[in-house]
Curated annotation (Swiss-Prot):
InterPro entries reported for this sequence: Mediator_Med17
Family according to the record: Belongs to the Mediator complex subunit 17 family.
Tissue occurrence: Ubiquitous.
Annotated localization: Nucleus
Predominant location category: nucleus
Name of the molecule in the record: Mediator of RNA polymerase II transcription subunit 17
Name of the gene encoding the protein in the UniProt record: MED17
Function: Component of the Mediator complex, a coactivator involved in the regulated transcription of nearly all RNA polymerase II-dependent genes. Mediator functions as a bridge to convey information from gene-specific regulatory proteins to the basal RNA polymerase II transcription machinery. Mediator is recruited to promoters by direct interactions with regulatory proteins and serves as a scaffold for the assembly of a functional preinitiation complex with RNA polymerase II and the general transcription factors.
Disease: Microcephaly, postnatal progressive, with seizures and brain atrophy: A disorder characterized by postnatal progressive microcephaly and severe developmental retardation associated with cerebral and cerebellar atrophy. Infants manifest swallowing difficulties leading to failure to thrive, jitteriness, poor visual fixation, truncal arching, seizures. There is no acquisition of developmental milestones and patients suffer from marked spasticity and profound retardation. Progressive microcephaly becomes evident few months after birth.
Positions of the UniProt region annotated as Disordered: 51-83
Organism annotation: Homo sapiens
Gene Ontology MF annotations: nuclear thyroid hormone receptor binding; nuclear vitamin D receptor binding; transcription coactivator activity; transcription coregulator activity; ubiquitin protein ligase activity
Pfam families (UniProt xref): Med17 (PF10156)
GO cellular component terms attached to this protein's record: core mediator complex; mediator complex; membrane; nucleoplasm; nucleus; transcription regulator complex; ubiquitin ligase complex
Quaternary data: Interacts with GATA1 and PPARG. Component of the Mediator complex, which is composed of MED1, MED4, MED6, MED7, MED8, MED9, MED10, MED11, MED12, MED13, MED13L, MED14, MED15, MED16, MED17, MED18, MED19, MED20, MED21, MED22, MED23, MED24, MED25, MED26, MED27, MED29, MED30, MED31, CCNC, CDK8 and CDC2L6/CDK11. The MED12, MED13, CCNC and CDK8 subunits form a distinct module termed the CDK8 module. Mediator containing the CDK8 module is less active than Mediator lacking this module in supporting transcriptional activation.
Amino acid sequence: MSGVRAVRISIESACEKQVHEVGLDGTETYLPPLSMSQNLARLAQRIDFSQGSGSEEEEAAGTEGDAQEWPGAGSSADQDDEEGVVKFQPSLWPWDSVRNNLRSALTEMCVLYDVLSIVRDKKFMTLDPVSQDALPPKQNPQTLQLISKKKSLAGAAQILLKGAERLTKSVTENQENKLQRDFNSELLRLRQHWKLRKVGDKILGDLSYRSAGSLFPHHGTFEVIKNTDLDLDKKIPEDYCPLDVQIPSDLEGSAYIKVSIQKQAPDIGDLGTVNLFKRPLPKSKPGSPHWQTKLEAAQNVLLCKEIFAQLSREAVQIKSQVPHIVVKNQIISQPFPSLQLSISLCHSSNDKKSQKFATEKQCPEDHLYVLEHNLHLLIREFHKQTLSSIMMPHPASAPFGHKRMRLSGPQAFDKNEINSLQSSEGLLEKIIKQAKHIFLRSRAAATIDSLASRIEDPQIQAHWSNINDVYESSVKVLITSQGYEQICKSIQLQLNIGVEQIRVVHRDGRVITLSYQEQELQDFLLSQMSQHQVHAVQQLAKVMGWQVLSFSNHVGLGPIESIGNASAITVASPSGDYAISVRNGPESGSKIMVQFPRNQCKDLPKSDVLQDNKWSHLRGPFKEVQWNKMEGRNFVYKMELLMSALSPCLL
């Protein structure tokens, strides 16, 4: 065997890929080979960082492993130690050097962290500075130069600090002087709008209307104070004003006079507890100071209190059939039966309690702003009358006295006329009359609108005048038929709505007076709409050449109408062969009868008296037309079709 030549054999793995699965038929499924990144990750997972990294332990472990793995290697190792020859020891782990470097870096970081903790906390160790050698007694010229520069810089800094302190004081004084000038300028603006006077060391103003003729006893005095709630160190706010006003506590907040009309009277227990809803304060005009808005609101509160006091005084003094009721902040009057007029003083202050009460008592809007505005106009007129009645300064040699007394001499006024001039209506009486007119006008408008929406034929139109009086309004009512406005315009009514009655003026000048009852106006308009149908037939007959035989607005025959009277008209065809009779009532409606010639009436019995043929041309009895089966959009259109069917065809 020794003489046989050696053969070189290449040994390689039997399978380059690992077998994943072997099927029942012997088919093997291989795993794909790992990529370089996957192989790197697999090798990194084999590193055990928990074991020690000492070289002695590794060498000991390697020696023991080799001794256990190769029993015959002990003697050779001893021989190597004795000889002192260092042999290469392979590592047990992949990337062993990487692991060792990472562990050493971690150890250094831990040591650095501990040192920093000791330096910062100083609980366990204190670091003393390293002592330096003392400088020689002889100083360098550079050191002397540095010391001189430091002294000069310190002197310059002291000068700058003193200058900055002086500048700060001057700025503060300028701000104080500016605030003082602003206070004087604001006080000048305040004097341009309000009456001011100086009493002692205080500046007082007047909110009342005494100079305009008011007799309200409230003093209405406010005080002008200087606003000192400003920190000069902070930035001045944009809305800052150096002047402020202090008004009486009873004039704070907002107030208004609420006037409402109620159809049903509330219980007697509800009187004086009117639901208040807070009206927002008026927004200040851009550029106006805040004290202007504050004083205007306070003056408005004072005026509202004066109006309510005047109304309460008149309500107690006036003797009426239904006495007026004054309870707390509410005045209740009864202008019409089952109708109430409520006048309330609503005053809400700026405190939280009143705001909470206002939010809880918030109610729907039923306030009549027109009457509130009229109350303000009436109180100003009352002020003007009071101011004009005051005797002005006059010469002693020619006294002219009161205006009414002056007029009584030249114009020879007697006592009754002078008394009539002196007697005038009060504020409450005027506002009650205006409330009556507003309620009557709204009721008339509602009645006309309900009829216009309920009745389509004929149509009713209302044209309200935009120029009205506080005690009288006018509306023009037109009753027309759709498509026939040019020929059917005979019903034109002018309604003059007053305080307690409505005057109706017809087109021909007739005048009818209606009361405040809603039913009277409704019945009158229904009767006029009924008469319009008959007038439309009359105008249509003239256009189509038919002859009007009879016409009456008030028919005495037939069923009696509960609303007004029925009207009727009879027209004949141009040839005289046919006749149409129309009767229209407000409740019974329309009834149309047609009269045919006798020769066309087959159901007439033969008469032994009338033997001549000329009597056959006379018209026979009337036959009623089934009006609801006629085609047409309205009454006049149906009547036009009926007349066209009965008229001869002219070719």
